[in-house]
Amino acid sequence: MIKSSYGGKVLADCIRDLGVNTVFTVPGESFLPVLNGLYDHKNFIKVITCRHESGAANMAEAWGKLTGFPGIAFVTRGPGACHASIGIHTAMQDSSPMIVFIGQIHSKHKGREAFQEVDYIKMFGVPFSKG
C-alpha cells in the first residue's frame, strides 16, 4: 500500500535526508503543513521557535557561518519575509550558507494584492541567491 503524503511532509523528509538537524522559525499559517512535517521528525530535527523573523534569519545566518552547513529559516509571507531580510542580506554579504523558506499565498490569488502578498523577486532582487 502506498502511503499518502503532502508537500510539507515531502519538504521535511527531504531536509532530514540531507542531514539538516536544526531549523529556525516563527510559526506561521502560510506554512503549517511544513511544521506538521517537521513534527514527524522531532527526534531528528530540532525546531528553534523564535519571537521574531529577524531573530530566526539572524540565527540561521550565524548557524551557517559557524558550522559551514546551511542555516535553515522558515518565515511567513509578507511581513515575515520583510523582517527576515536583514539576516538574508547579511548571509549574502558574508557568503554564509543559508536557506530561507518563505510562506506564500495560494497560487489562485497571486498577483491580485492578496493578504500580505509580496513580490519576492522585486523585494530581494535578482539573483535571489549567490553561488
Range-by-range predicted roles:
Residues M1-G131:
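N-terminal alpha/beta PP-like core and its mobile active-site loop of ThDP/TPP-dependent enzymes
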